[in-house]
A protein has these predicted regions:
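Extended, aromatic/histidine-rich regions of cofactor-dependent oxidoreductases associated
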Residues: 1-191
Length: 191
């Protein structure tokens, strides 16, 4: 299996999906209405700003926003960055090579005036698929769908320059309130 390769003792090649515990639970997605999609292998478009990002500190002035984008559907076509929680977008520069199914670096020049701001990035692939907001993601998928979670990760820069998770809590769901959980926010768990 792909989950515990360190315990590999033998390899069995088959032309059918493995029906092992980890493959059936981790590669199964639950939709918002409770339907189950088994064996969803492809990761939809995703991007993440790596600078500035959580735990870092920045000073007012000019900065180069940097990050990574990828898609399981092929080549990244563009990445956009928002400084106002998605009301407006600026196109980032993709650094070559831009290959199908591969990480692509992006960058965008930006001046920070020292006021609180929330940064978002979103990726688009060559098939027209785009990265959803958290709200869009959870209208489609269950709140515990963390293995294929690809919603926009927000970074909030506070006036003192600290960069923290900028995701807003989502409110009540089937398992109570869901908010940002440690790390980069990529793990979405009911807390």
């Amino acid at each position: 299996g792909s989950i515990q390769v360190k315990w590999l003792r033998r390899i069995l090649v088959t032309d059918l999906p493995a029906m092992a515990k980890d493959e059936t639970s981790e590669y199964t997605d639950v939709t918002a209405d409770g339907r189950v999609l088994a064996f969803t292998w492809v990761m939809e478009p995703q991007s993440i700003i790596t600078y500035p990002s959580g735990g870092q500190r920045v000073q007012p002035g000019f900065h180069e926003i940097r990050g990574l984008a990828w898609s399981g559907f092929g080549r990244i076509a563009k990445v956009e960055v928002s400084f106002d929680e998605g009301r407006t977008w600026r196109k980032a520069v993709l650094e070559p090579p831009v290959e199908p199914y591969a990480f692509v670096r992006f960058k965008l020049q930006w001046y920070w005036d020292g006021k609180e701001v929330v940064l978002w990035s979103r990726a688009w692939d060559e098939k027209g698929n785009t990265q959803p907001t958290r709200e869009e993601f959870f209208r489609r998928w269950s709140r515990n769908n963390r293995y294929h979670y690809n919603a926009i990760q927000a970074w909030r820069i506070l006036p003192d320059g600290r960069v923290v998770n900028g995701d807003r809590p989502l409110g009540q769901g089937a398992f109570g309130p869901v908010g940002p959980v440690g790390g980069c926010g990529g793990e979405v768990l009911d807390v």
